[in-house]
Amino acid sequence: MDITGYTKWQYKTINASILKSIGHQELIYYVEILSPWPVSNRDLVVHLRIEQNSITEITQFHCRGIPDYIPAKEGVSRVPMSRSTWHVEPIANNKLKIEYTMEIDPSGSVPAWLMNKLSAEGPYESFFALKNSILSRNYSKADAPF
């Protein structure tokens, strides 16, 4: 997992780092997300678990927030609850079907107009940037440890 690469494609992510590796298919990481005024930046600590079916090669990334893992950063709102899943399925040579679901409590007061904007814009911008990042950084030859 290229967690530090999140800043290149994950929408509004300004900091990403691995806090702990727990084998080849599990880790804990930290991300900070830039938020527009008047909202303070948000951060998350995430426990990531990866599963892959050896026959179908379908890979699932299960992410769960663990907000108390490290102390909160001053001036940044810690996300108290987050869950997400990436379902990645090979469908043809060099083609993937990716389904992403996320449930999040952003913490604090976030105007509805801003949540609506980010909910619509974030996934689109992230997937667009992810595709470009994969193509430009040539991840097709990457060796996955699972």
Q: For the regions a protein language model found, what residue spans apply to each?
A:
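Eukaryotic helix-grip
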Residues: M1-F146
